[in-house]
Swiss-Prot record:
Example GO BP: septin ring organization
Top-rank taxon: Eukaryota
Source species of the chain: Schizosaccharomyces pombe (strain 972 / ATCC 24843) (Fission yeast)
SMART domains linked to this entry: PH
Region (Disordered): 62-102, 145-180
Pfam family, one: PH
Name of this protein: Septin ring organizing protein mid2
């Protein structure tokens, strides 16, 4: 049954539409984004164009020209992408082929798989008579000489290889592979006995069979399946290799309806090996006799114009890693497109010429943290000054004293501090007794300071008798005389009346009380309590009370001892002033004349403690700093207007003047009267504190700790 022209046109359009749908597959090129990836978009477009031309060369009966039949075929050509490394024009030497054309120009280049038997190209589901009639009506007939040559060559079994029937599955399609070690299946394509002698000389690696995933078409769509299968079968018979997704290292779970295979036009080795690319990376797994892959532009210069309305298949982003067996294929792409290689470390490496152990960023001392930077600055300052700073210790009160005291009698006590030659008057001792005495330690401080508490205690004495009394005395027990206070303390104190000791760890205090007042409660330990009922028992230390103290530590600073504070209160007051000196009090726009401004200039000002800082009006760049510690007066311009006018001075209703101790002055005026009043009230409120801020020891201390 002959097909009409409209049916033929419709059938051709359906065939091309199926080809376009088949081309929408994940690309074997490992690419991400064409604009910023390692592979240029031109290669992908050339690959699609080449694949379209290869399909367009096949007629309805799926007869396509062999890649090995072209004059430009080189040794190991597998990719039609490389246009720069080819030495000959690609398509000019071939005769122009129309779609569904079977006329092919034969070249002298020898190819084993250059012909296919007419019986192997038939399709069982398609009527052979319809196909032949369609070819007779649409295509150019072969000449008599070429037809006779073709029939003679096809009848020779040594020069042709019959492909499998077109209705077999893709898993049975035999495919010649470049490297059999990398093939999925290493079964031979045909028996070695049927090979010609010429083929044994040319071919190095034996052809193998590649198992391909099946299509996901419906069972009812037989026309498309049979046409594609017959086309693939004929291409195999002509030496056209099939490149699948699996062959490039992709998993089978990524195959779908679009997993139609595109022919990359494989060829066997050629005698002309000087055109082979030698700059491609050779893997160690490649055999020594295997030649590297080369490129050909056989189908790039085709005059055939693709349909502009046809959708161009996009290459999606490939997230899986490539198969390491095809490293040479990926290296070929790198050699074509890569211009530079960027390597970036994901870890930070710290290099040093000194061998030292890594220390933690914080050091724990009695559950109190001290920044390591401050600790280093403190240790360096101690080495430079050769001192240990100043330690303030204030004894506040004695709490919860448990030693027995005589009722109705006053027990007095005193204390001594190691390293201090002090004489403390006797004071009354109770269970809670206030002391409130402060002491400073300027010289080198030992690791601990011991405070010893001592009570007024008289040990018992034996009454002695005269000589005459001894003669006339009886054998009575000698009596002892003691006062009630000493009698109550007997057995709880030492012979000199010491009833407790308090130990202050200076190493701990120097870190916990650095630059601040630290309140501590320390135990009072007694080492002289003895049980009267027990005999020859060594006394054990026991807690008999608590002592509350306040400590404050200043590190060694490059200032004289006279400049250091004399007490904890003065040190805390100076530090509060230093903290206030860093506080923002007022800000806004003012016009200034004087100082660094010989004429009126509008600036943005900030009153930070005792400093009036000027910034640029727009960029807010710091321009000048006015120290108000030497300022003595803040004068309103309205006050000057009532008195004698100054020569050359311009008075403003919203202006004021700052006068310094050396007679200099700077004039300001605000944008409104309300802003002027706010500035003047803030300046007058804090002007008295500005003169007390600048202490040398606070500057030195803050430079160490902040």
């Amino acid at each position: 049954m002959l097909m009409t022209a409209s049916q033929q046109d419709q059938h051709a359009k359906m065939y091309l539409a199926d080809i376009h749908r088949a081309l929408r597959i994940p690309s074997p090129i490992p690419s991400t984004d064409y604009e910023c990836s390692d592979y240029a978009s031109t290669i992908a477009s050339i690959s699609r164009e080449s694949t379209m031309r290869n399909f367009n060369r096949s007629n309805i009966s799926s007869t396509a020209p062999s890649f090995a039949e072209s004059e430009d075929a080189e040794d190991g050509d597998s990719f039609p992408y490389d246009q720069t490394l080819s030495n000959s024009s690609s398509f000019d030497d071939h005769q122009s082929l129309l779609p569904f054309s079977t006329e092919v120009r034969r070249t002298p280049t020898y190819s084993v798989m250059n012909e296919t038997d007419s019986s192997s190209t038939s399709v069982e589901d398609v009527n052979k008579e319809n196909i032949l009639s369609l070819n007779d009506s649409c295509l150019i007939k072969l000449s008599d000489d070429e037809a006779s040559n073709k029939s003679s060559r096809s009848s020779t079994p040594r020069n042709s290889i019959k492909s499998n029937s077109s209705n077999q599955g893709h898993g049975d399609i035999p495919i010649p592979k470049k490297n059999p070690a990398r093939s999925v299946c290493n079964s031979k394509l045909f028996n070695e006995d049927t090979l010609p002698a010429e083929f044994e000389e040319v071919s190095i690696s034996p052809p193998v069979k590649l198992e391909l995933p099946t299509h996901s078409h419906n069972s009812s769509d037989t026309s498309f399946t049979n046409s594609i299968v017959s086309s693939v079968s004929d291409m195999v018979g002509l030496g056209e290799g099939i490149n699948s997704i699996a062959s490039f290292g992709f998993s089978e779970d990524s195959s779908s309806f679009q997993d139609i295979k595109t022919p990359p036009r494989l060829s066997f080795a050629d005698e002309n090996r000087e055109n082979c690319r030698t700059d491609i990376y050779r893997s160690d797994s490649i055999h020594e006799y295997e030649e590297p892959l080369t490129s050909s532009i056989t189908s790039l210069d085709s005059p055939h114009v693709l349909d502009e309305n046809a959708p161009i298949p996009l290459l999606p982003k490939v997230v899986s890693l490539p198969d390491p067996r095809f490293t040479n294929v990926l290296s070929a792409f790198d050699a074509l497109t890569r211009t530079y290689l960027l390597r970036q470390n994901s870890k930070v490496v710290h290099a040093t010429s000194q061998k030292q152990e890594m220390q933690t960023s914080r050091r724990v001392v009695n559950s109190c943290y001290m920044p390591e930077s401050l600790s280093r600055n403190l240790s360096s300052s101690l080495q430079q000054t050769g001192g240990s700073g100043r330690l303030f210790v204030r004894l506040m009160e004695i709490r919860n004293l448990t030693i027995p005291l005589a009722s109705g009698m006053t027990t007095r006590f005193t204390y001594t501090i190691s390293g201090k030659h002090i004489q403390v008057p006797w004071n009354a001792l109770h269970s809670t007794t206030k002391i409130e005495n402060e002491y400073t330690f300027d010289e080198s401080i030992s690791s601990s300071i011991v405070c010893t508490l001592r009570a007024a205690y008289d040990p018992p004495k034996v009454r002695t008798r005269s000589t005459l009394g001894k003669v006339f005395s009886t054998n009575k027990r000698k009596s002892m005389t003691t006062d009630p206070v000493s009698e109550a303390l007997h057995g709880f104190v030492s012979e000199d009346g010491t009833f407790g000791e308090v130990t202050i760890n200076t190493d701990s205090v120097s870190r916990t009380a650095l630059g601040r007042c630290q309140s501590m409660v320390l135990p009072i330990m007694n080492k002289w309590t003895v049980d009267p009922a027990a005999k020859d028992v060594k006394p054990l230390p026991r807690k008999v009370g608590e002592l509350e103290i306040h400590v404050f530590f200043l590190p060694a600073l490059p200032v004289s001892l006279k400049e250091l504070p004399a007490s904890i209160e003065s040190a805390m007051y100076d530090l509060k002033l230093a903290e206030w000196d860093r506080t923002l009090l007022c800000d806004g726009y003012l016009c200034q004349q004087g100082g660094d401004c010989p004429y009126w200039r509008r600036r943005y000002f900030q009153l930070i403690g005792s400093k009036l800082v000027a910034f640029q009006q727009f960029s807010k760049v710091r321009r000048a700093t006015i120290d108000l510690s030497e300022a003595t007066h803040i004068v309103d311009d309205n006050h000057y207007s009532d008195e004698e006018e100054l020569e050359g001075y311009l008075y403003f209703e919203s202006g004021f003047r700052i006068i310094f101790s050396n007679g200099d002055y700077i004039d300001f005026y605000a944008e409104t009267v309300g802003e002027k009043d706010e500035w003047m009230s803030t300046l007058r409120q804090h002007l008295g504190q500005c003169s007390m801020v600048h202490k040398n020891w606070t500057k030195s201390f803050l430079s160490l700790s902040f």
